[in-house]
Swiss-Prot record:
Membrane topology: Peripheral membrane protein
Pfam families, A to Z: Ldh_1_C, Ldh_1_N
Reaction catalysis annotation: (S)-malate + NAD(+) = oxaloacetate + NADH + H(+)
Its job: Malate dehydrogenase; catalyzes a reversible NAD-dependent dehydrogenase reaction involved in central metabolism and redox homeostasis.
Tissue: Expressed constitutively in roots.
Assembly behavior: Monomer.
Residues annotated as binding oxaloacetate: 99, 132, 163, 188, 243
SUPFAM superfamilies the UniProt entry points to: LDH C-terminal domain-like, NAD(P)-binding Rossmann-fold domains
Protein name according to UniProt: Malate dehydrogenase, cytoplasmic
């Protein structure tokens, strides 16, 4: 029996990440090789022509799973009936801009998109915010779409999670698919805490702790952390654009694991609404280790936290609290 198509919204769809993301969705990377999709692409009026070009290319690619394409600058049309919303559109920080200016622009974007999703998306729509500041944009969206369950509003920290996996696999010269259970705690910013204390590597003699195999705490507590924290900036420096294909790929990973479930014994990082777990203040969107099954995520409980980790986790929570205050001051 063929599945009913799922409607997937991508905002900012004419941009760099959007251009990398829509073919992945149309190929079944996000929702599975047997799941037909209808793509809803939204962008701002100045990008309308470019957006139409992307639509033409999607038609030209003749993707078997792609059952329709909506390309629009109208937020209501874009949000109508969507089952998954990937929010890539936002206002990027330009040179010389204050953080508050960027924040107020994004607050107004996410406030209006929240209202449109709330009124027009399918019931139980799953939302993933990618645009920076991702955690706080997601928080604003959640606040202004009260009828969307809070568990359905998430932000992307899977990119940071995958970056951490990549660094470990390079350091140990192992397959990245054999490394698991790194954690990104906190904000999708340079204050995030990439934690390897619970991470393992599959070896010929079973699973071994990453810390034991690397056996260089100075690197793990120093350069490893800063490399992951600063990776986005390093890519901008090298490519002159921010990371697009890796962001698109990790957005697919995030939604796929959320919808289809995580493998047994594996956890991933997602920015989710805090319930006070691990002493993180509730009322923040904070990255936690989670497992997913039946379309629901659950925070992994009971992991021991050492003093070094505690400080880092608190520092990134503090930054998120400050961002939240700044965002709310933009609403007044």
């Amino acid at each position: 029996m063929a599945k009913e198509p799922m409607r997937v919204l991508v905002t900012g769809a004419a941009g760099q990440i959007g251009y990398a993301l829509v073919p992945m969705i149309a190929r079944g990377v996000m929702l599975g090789a047997d799941q037909p999709v209808i793509l809803h692409m939204l962008d701002i009026p100045p990008a309308a022509e470019a957006l139409n070009g992307v639509k033409m290319e999607l038609v030209d690619a003749a993707f078997p799973l792609l059952k329709g394409v909506v390309a629009t600058t109208d937020v209501v049309e874009a949000c109508t009936g969507v089952n998954v919303a990937v929010m890539v559109g936002g206002f990027p920080r330009k040179e010389g801009m204050e953080r508050k200016d960027v924040m107020s622009k994004n607050v107004s974007i996410y406030k209006s998109q929240a209202s449109a999703l709330e009124a027009h998306a399918a019931p139980n729509c799953k939302v993933l915010v990618v645009a920076n500041p991702a955690n706080t944009n997601a928080l604003i969206l959640k606040e202004f779409a009260p009828s969307i369950p809070e568990k359905n509003v998430t932000c992307l920290t899977r990119l940071d999670h995958n970056r951490a996996l990549g660094q470990i696999s390079e350091r140990l010269n192992v397959q990245v698919s054999d490394v698991k259970n790194v954690i990104i705690w906190g904000n999708h910013s340079s204050s995030q805490y990439p934690d390897v204390n619970h991470a393992t590597v599959k070896t010929s003699t079973g699973e071994k702790p990453v810390r034991e195999l690397v056996s260089d705490d100075e690197w793990l507590n120093g350069e490893f952390i800063t490399t992951v924290q600063q990776r986005g900036a390093a890519i901008i420096k090298a490519r002159k654009f921010s990371s697009a294909l890796s962001a698109a790929s990790s957005a697919c990973d995030h939604i796929r694991d959320w919808v289809l479930g995580t493998p047994e014994g594996t956890f991933v990082s997602m920015g989710v609404y805090s319930d006070g777990s691990y002493g993180v203040p509730s009322g923040l969107i904070y990255s936690f280790p989670v497992t997913c099954s039946g379309g629901e995520w659950k925070i992994v409980q009971g992991l021991p936290i050492d003093e070094f980790s505690r400080k880092k986790m608190d520092a990134t929570a503090q930054e998120l609290t400050e961002e939240k205050t700044l965002a709310y001051s933009c609403l007044e």
